[in-house]
Amino acid sequence: MSSQSITIDLWTDIACPWCYIGETIFELSKSSFLSLHPSTTITTIIHSYMIDPSTKPEGEDYLSYNKRRWGSDSWTIQLKEIGKQIGCNFKNWKFWANTLKAHMLLQESKKFGKEDEIIFDLYRLSYEEGKNISNENVLNDLAKKYELKEWNNESNKMKVLEEDQIGKNKFDIHGVPMFIFKETGRKIEGAADPKKFVYEMELALKK
């Protein structure tokens, strides 16, 4: 008998604009898949990953960071065009965040099953509202929305660092978002075509 549940491990970083796009495509694909398989449950387990832990703790100016890393921000032109097609806007992208503390808040939200909502709020704050999600005041405001009081602690910090290292060392992840389907062990990296996500879900369901 085919399984009626699918579990996906997702490694992601809020400072990764392709993660915003890739996860939005995934959510759209998931809705499409569930319309065909309404009795199926899809569980996404979010894991913290930091692309550039050396980003200044307070975050960095968007353009300055791009110039330092890549010489310019010209690579974002295609990104923004793709994002626009699925409702991901980057109109107020002002900071390149150090995401350690944002991931700590995300870890706290996982204890209460609020991670799926809060991660998209973090993306919107960063890319659409021009907020610096390295800033504790910004994160505290978001924490209040979800009634998360004790997020800024050593336990959450250690969990972030642990998941980051597991992703990089155990699973050899060098790019995010990375979706790993537990039933098949198959992977999807990046902002893949919606049909690819649906195909992998179909394979997972047959296991």
Feature-to-residue mapping (PLM):
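C-terminal cap of thioredoxin/glutaredoxin-like
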Residues: I8-W11, E23-S35, I42, I46, ...
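Eukaryotic N-terminal targeting leaders
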Residues: M1-Q4
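Structural alpha/beta surface segment adjacent to cysteine/selenocysteine redox centers
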Residues: T24-S126
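Short cysteine clusters
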Residues: C16-C19
